[in-house]
Amino acid sequence: MASASTSKYNSHSLENESIKRTSRDGVNRDLTEAVPRLPGETLITDKEVIYICPFNGPIKGRVYITNYRLYLRSLETDSALILDVPLGVISRIEKMGGATSRGENSYGLDITCKDMRNLRFALKQEGHSRRDMFEILTRYAFPLAHSLPLFAFLNEEKFNVDGWTVYNPVEEYRRQGLPNHHWRITFINKCYELCDTYPAPLVVPYRASDDDLRRVATFRSRNRIPVLSWIHPENKTVIVRCSQPLVGMSGKRNKDDEKYLDVIRETNKQISKLTIYDARPSVNAVANKATGGGYESDDAYHNAELFFLDIHNIHVMRESLKKVKDIVYPNVEESHWLSSLESTHWLEHIKLVLTGAIQVADKVSSGKSSVLVHCSDGWDRTAQLTSLAMLMLDSFYRSIEGFEILVQKEWISFGHKFASRIGHGDKNHTDADRSPIFLQFIDCVWQMSKQFPTAFEFNEQFLIIILDHLYSCRFGTFLFNCESARERQKVTERTVSLWSLINSNKEKFKNPFYTKEINRVLYPVASMRHLELWVNYYIRWNPRIKQQQPNPVEQRYMELLALRDEYIKRLEELQLANSAKLSDPPTSPSSPSQMMPHVQTHF
């Protein structure tokens, strides 16, 4: 797994590597400048430092800090090292050493990042060098604590496509065949008065009035009532999402909620029961009763079957990822790799999430039963399960644009707390709300793409760039906790969408082996034998680990596709030229244009 150490270590994100190859993303390409800059990006300061590289030792360099990134360029002739770190990636900045520190390179800054790497810089003790760099980094990495805007609100990039137009909720519901005689679209939440963390348009049973919805909302955590996420195109079974019922220790009941779930059940005439998947371990669901929550009991919900999926909470997932980071950065212990990976429990959690989503998809497709999914508040594990199940069931979501719509719909519009889970611009790195829930979802998607290499239009780079900009604060896509907050901040007017960047250069993110198959259901194998650590993401910063290179067959196939496209373009140009000649009035019976055959392409 390990390869020989190299003296040239480039710690770039995938996106920053693309900056050097293309100007489509709007980066300043002036090679006389020391640091690449986006429109709206300004240089704040620069300073000579010693970068304590965990792989090659101390390297003298100059660090540049802008209002968007930390950029380090090596000053040593035998090193081509460049570090390019968006400030949004930084989780914590700590001072290293004190005034009495005498060890070599023992005085400086330690920087912890959200993307599985740490940085250490040694600075001179005189001239307040460390203090100045610490204060500037803290100010721009954590702008919310200093009444400064996130960089997304300063970014002036322009693209030839508008990513904000990718998702239109009503159009997406119409694609699914909604509304119909069982389901209607309501705008009761237009002003976010019913539920401030739900989107404005909701799909609910046709027989449920808006007054019914208001009464049901009083019995669901955060007023997150059961609403439709997806409907099967043939058997018309549905996936419905919500939060936990407010049962409490006394076992409270709510006739309106019970009746509402019955109405949902009755939209499906094939099965007499509604299947409820509670994402939590049963012991946690019982414990939630102490804080007013709970689950649907058999006594209250006679026509429902309840299953617990044993997926752990945000705190367990956060600690698990910390353990992954400990074993992959900076060094990988080859001799204890398997036991170390097992001790993180990360792949066990991936397995449980995938297993739960498979159960949801199978129950809807093969079991012909409508399904209701919830966890506690319905914005973490619930989003994982519904979106993964929809990805398995609906081939549309496996296209580039379809996946963007899936993320916009099930995660962004339905209130996954991105600001709280990621901590955009927030210095409180110990916040208990931080958790890698969305990363876990993307990891599950990657696991599926490994098992079904022709089923997804997008490639691995597509997934990695989404994760890179989950943290970067360059785009407005993942900012804030819910749709109502984004509307208040006018995010779609004042920021650029990540989908603008991706969709303006789609070829870069396409899987050359993609085969479009409509209505094919994917059932990944969620066993530990078939799951693996995503090396190209989690261990990409370590130059000693041999990254998984593109398959030579894949590379050749992409070259042939490019060649085919070039030939098609040239043939089309010939056809246009030929058509123009044929439309000209003949100059003589033996005009060459009359004798030229019409060129056709058989591609």
Swiss-Prot record:
Allosterically activated by phosphatidylinositol 5-phosphate (PI5P). The modification Phosphoserine is found at residues 13, 18, 588. Residues 14-25 have a biased composition (Basic and acidic residues). The active site is at 375 (phosphocysteine intermediate). It is a peripheral membrane protein. Its EC number is 3.1.3.95. Residues 1-25, 579-603 are annotated as: Disordered. The GRAM domain mediates binding to PI(3,5)P2 and, with lower affinity, to other phosphoinositides. This is Myotubularin. It comes from Pongo abelii. The lineage of its organism: Eukaryota, Metazoa, Chordata, Craniata, Vertebrata. The gene is MTM1.
